[in-house]
């Protein structure tokens, strides 16, 4: 019996392992999260594995009925730290191919896990990362189209969802990926939908109304597949317009993301059949105890529940 109610939680930035803490703390964190209602499953990054302690460790310490949405963002950014050309939308052909090879690893990993646990991984979030040193949007779009043609041709056992990140054309890019209009144009011929992340859209224009605009654009194109809520701030520990997954307001006093914003995006999505809905939040204090890490996530669940009342 698969669990299709509740939220997909990007809990990993709150996990003790995100701050290289002990395995005992990590076990306590997942045990408390497992006892939390309204969770459908997890958004989990995949570097070599789905968890720093391995795939099996994650499966063993989380409920069997939780589903997983895999995100490519963490490894994409790690690799771009060493080579800014790495990405599916990169005009650097060698690095574009290196990124496609990483997606081949994801494909093999996901299919192996789903072969052993049918329906465990429901979606992969992919990203249109261009060559960081080349501002040419047309070249990035062309590169993304070539990557997509190859990656989409594989026999995936999960859905593919493009997570929009702040665009390379924005005033102060953090990720600086392909603009949404170019993403939608490239996805037109594919059964690949779009995930809008609240902060990643707000950061793009340094504008808290842009997530709603992006949600509307994706919906009108018939491509809205998921909504994920991460916050951003103007000051304080989470910085100025940073992509650091600030919790909801008022739990995080500086957060720009409110229950009203959630309500707006859900109203805009309306009858669109979302593949998943959830949030990703970061514990900014590396020395925080497990209870505070869990409190951030439980507040996120409460915020989404409240927005739907």
From Swiss-Prot:
Q: What is the annotated role of this protein in its UniProt record? A: Member of the yiaKLX1X2PQRS operon; however YiaX1 is not required for L-ascorbate utilization under aerobic conditions.
Q: Where is the signal peptide?
A: none
Q: Which InterPro entries match?
A: DUF4862 (IPR032344), Xyl_isomerase-like_sf (IPR036237)
Pfam families hit by this protein? DUF4862
Stimuli inducing this protein: Up-regulated by L-ascorbate and repressed by glucose.
Family, per entry: Belongs to the YiaX1 family.
Organism lineage reads as: Bacteria, Pseudomonadati, Pseudomonadota, Gammaproteobacteria, Enterobacterales
What name is this protein filed under? Uncharacterized protein YiaX1
Q: Which organism is it from?
A: Klebsiella pneumoniae
Name the source's superkingdom.
Bacteria
Q: Upon deletion of the gene, what happens?
A: Does not affect aerobic growth on L-ascorbate.
């Amino acid at each position: 019996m698969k669990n299709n109610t509740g939220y997909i939680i990007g809990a990993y930035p709150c996990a003790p392992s995100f701050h290289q803490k002990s395995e005992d703390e990590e076990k306590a964190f997942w045990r408390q999260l497992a006892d939390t209602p309204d969770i459908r499953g997890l958004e989990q990054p995949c570097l070599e594995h789905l968890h720093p302690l391995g795939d099996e460790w994650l499966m063993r310490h989380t409920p069997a009925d939780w589903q997983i949405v895999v995100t490519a963002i963490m490894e994409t950014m790690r690799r771009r730290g060493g080579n800014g050309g790495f990405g599916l939308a990169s005009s650097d052909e060698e690095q574009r191919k290196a990124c496609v090879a990483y997606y081949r690893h994801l494909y093999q990993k996901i299919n192996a896990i789903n072969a052993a646990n049918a329906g465990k991984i429901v979606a992969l979030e992919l990203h249109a990362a261009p060559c960081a040193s080349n501002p040419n949007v047309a070249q990035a779009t062309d590169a993304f189209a070539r990557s997509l043609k190859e990656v989409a041709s594989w026999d995936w056992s999960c859905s593919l969802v493009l997570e929009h990140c702040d665009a390379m054309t924005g005033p102060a890019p953090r990720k600086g990926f392909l603009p949404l209009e170019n993403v939608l144009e490239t996805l037109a011929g594919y059964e690949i939908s779009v995930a809008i992340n609240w902060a990643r859209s707000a950061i793009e224009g340094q504008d808290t109304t842009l997530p709603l605009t992006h949600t509307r654009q994706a919906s009108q194109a018939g491509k809205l597949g998921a909504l994920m809520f991460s916050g951003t701030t103007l000051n304080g520990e989470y910085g100025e317009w940073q992509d650091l997954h600030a919790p909801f307001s008022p739990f995080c006093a500086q957060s720009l993301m409110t229950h009203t914003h959630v309500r707006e995006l859900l109203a805009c999505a309306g009858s669109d059949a979302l593949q998943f809905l959830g949030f990703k939040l970061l514990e900014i204090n590396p020395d925080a105890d497990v209870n505070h890490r869990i409190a951030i996530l439980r507040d996120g669940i409460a915020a989404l529940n409240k927005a739907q009342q």
